[in-house]
From Swiss-Prot:
Gene3D superfamilies: Collagenase (Catalytic Domain), Neutral endopeptidase , domain2. The modification Phosphoserine is found at S4, S6. Glycans are attached at N145, N211, N285, N311, N325, N628. Residues 56-750 form the Peptidase M13 domain. It comes from Mus musculus (Mouse). This is Neprilysin. GO terms for biological process: amyloid-beta clearance; amyloid-beta clearance by cellular catabolic process; amyloid-beta metabolic process; angiotensin maturation; bradykinin catabolic process; cellular response to cytokine stimulus; cellular response to UV-A; cellular response to UV-B. Residues 52-750 are extracellular. Its main location: membrane. Zn(2+) binds at H584, H588, E647. The lineage of its organism: Eukaryota, Metazoa, Chordata, Craniata, Vertebrata. A peptide binds at R103. The gene is Mme. Binds 1 zinc ion per subunit. GO terms for molecular function: cardiolipin binding; metallocarboxypeptidase activity; metalloendopeptidase activity; metallopeptidase activity; oligopeptidase activity; peptidase activity; peptide binding; phosphatidylserine binding.
Amino acid sequence: MGRSESQMDITDINAPKPKKKQRWTPLEISLSVLVLLLTIIAVTMIALYATYDDGICKSSDCIKSAARLIQNMDASVEPCTDFFKYACGGWLKRNVIPETSSRYSNFDILRDELEVILKDVLQEPKTEDIVAVQKAKTLYRSCINESAIDSRGGQPLLKLLPDIYGWPVASDNWDQTYGTSWTAEKSIAQLNSKYGKKVLINFFVGTDDKNSTQHIIHFDQPRLGLPSRDYYECTGIYKEACTAYVDFMISVARLIRQEQSLPIDENQLSLEMNKVMELEKEIANATTKPEDRNDPMLLYNKMTLAKLQNNFSLEVNGKSFSWSNFTNEIMSTVNINIQNEEEVVVYAPEYLTKLKPILTKYSPRDLQNLMSWRFIMDLVSSLSRNYKESRNAFRKALYGTTSETATWRRCANYVNGNMENAVGRLYVEAAFAGESKHVVEDLIAQIREVFIQTLDDLTWMDAETKKKAEEKALAIKERIGYPDDIISNENKLNNEYLELNYREDEYFENIIQNLKFSQSKQLKKLREKVDKDEWISGAAVVNAFYSSGRNQIVFPAGILQPPFFSAQQSNSLNYGGIGMVIGHEITHGFDDNGRNFNKDGDLVDWWTQQSANNFKDQSQCMVYQYGNFSWDLAGGQHLNGINTLGENIADNGGIGQAYRAYQNYVKKNGEEKLLPGLDLNHKQLFFLNFAQVWCGTYRPEYAVNSIKTDVHSPGNFRIIGTLQNSAEFADAFHCRKNSYMNPERKCRVW
């Protein structure tokens, strides 16, 4: 046998020979058939399960959404008893307010995350950066350069003081140096024209409410050193803030005197700063309460400058105050001359009337002490550590915070606030998914359509006013994401900041440069037309806006992210998130303020008398409802139903419109797959996602502050108030009648 025919065995050649095979028994045959059948069934089941649709979404985005919702909620709470605790109970257990924060919420977490992105893009050196971006990065570096800031102490401020007529309490010869030539017109104007600081009289150039294509000079009451006029009672919950405020003044005055090697007389410092407090108390009491300033028709008082002089004569230091000289002191800085025939708008006639007897009681020294202080207190945080620390007790009394915000966070926000388009460019390039713009455009179209359709449901509004409301809704312009120019037009962006030149080791001077630049730009607008295409917000902002003068809604790139929006998350969440926000902003065009402006943004009464009266009646229901909420964190104070009315109307309108738009979506596209791990349908998920946007809590000090200053209701009451008025919510969660979340009386405006 040739080699090629040899065989390789796969078994050992010594293996025993097999016996002759026996036939299978009936039992073996039966068992084999059974095994075969079971195998076929198992394979079939596996195949079926692999392709079986159980109606649950198993994508990674659905799993992420479900995990977030489950983590935030407390399913042990009955949703019809307290939907805030049901939706946010888990969030409240897991989250503690950071020592640097006055409040903490899902909104604040998104802002924190945005700040991290800003930090990353602002500190990254790139040789290919355009000039505008280079300037933003230099400004950021100057702000975080703490060694340079600390080494300079208070010297940058000391150099500036002569330009604002000094600070009497911090110098030994003020009466001789400035007192003899001091005039109220020059001193008040200098702070305003150069630095945009409005003390005693709030002079500003803004859009003419009744002719929104033009700018006009306005006179208004000023902001105060404490958060609201209520604080100046200085008793009870406000006592600590008043004490800390005066101590803050004294501490800074002491530091400035020390830096100049001037003697320190504690009694004199205390005497002068308490006099400042006394003066500011009188000014606070002269201001009109916010709830009496919410009708733009009543606020608008147009007259000539000559008429202003006749109607509101003031006397300071025994001399008549010249409104013409004061106005020209400011406007001459931008080479604009104002004649007595110039028309101006007075927003605060009552305040200007009450100001007269106050000014006659105080000396130039007292007035200058207040004015300089109000400017200095804004600048303390840009000086060395010892100046920053002088503010600690004051910050604690107002905000409850025991630590300063991290320097990089404060600096990222500062640069974003002052160079919003340059920073917006960096943010968009780093973090914004451009395709979401088209999805949001479609959502706006849907919700606008729902708003118009629901006008037919309103029995309190007549046909004539409904037609005008529809015209206004159709005319609302939308801005989504960011202005194209910040990416595509480098020259325009560079030119916007052409006059600004920052130095890395001169943060204080950079701040002053920004103040001057911003105020000069605003004053020059007096003889310019209003640019209605201009965005009213930067791109790197977690918020949304409505402008009554432009009839424009804005959704910056910063808010187009979960939980508000994602092209990959369930649409119930998108409609309950950004959908509600869209409805909210559209409704602002028709709230107690926005309803007074027409489709072109002009302050014009387009309502019939009957519809206007009915609107006020419908609104009164919400004033009463929200005004009845008492807030334990604010010492049991009741919310102000008048000051929060516009936001409450917008919340209620927004949730209703977004829900109806989602129902339309389901009719057209069918039901969505459910989310895993949640025994909730998509109607319920819509309301749950809406509520979880507002999960959060406040420090008691800041609750006391915000209940007087914030036009929004606190988050828990935004959830409860809105959903108590929603029959659709009660239906979705099967809430019995007269349960807490389903009261018999429901408020509805839109």
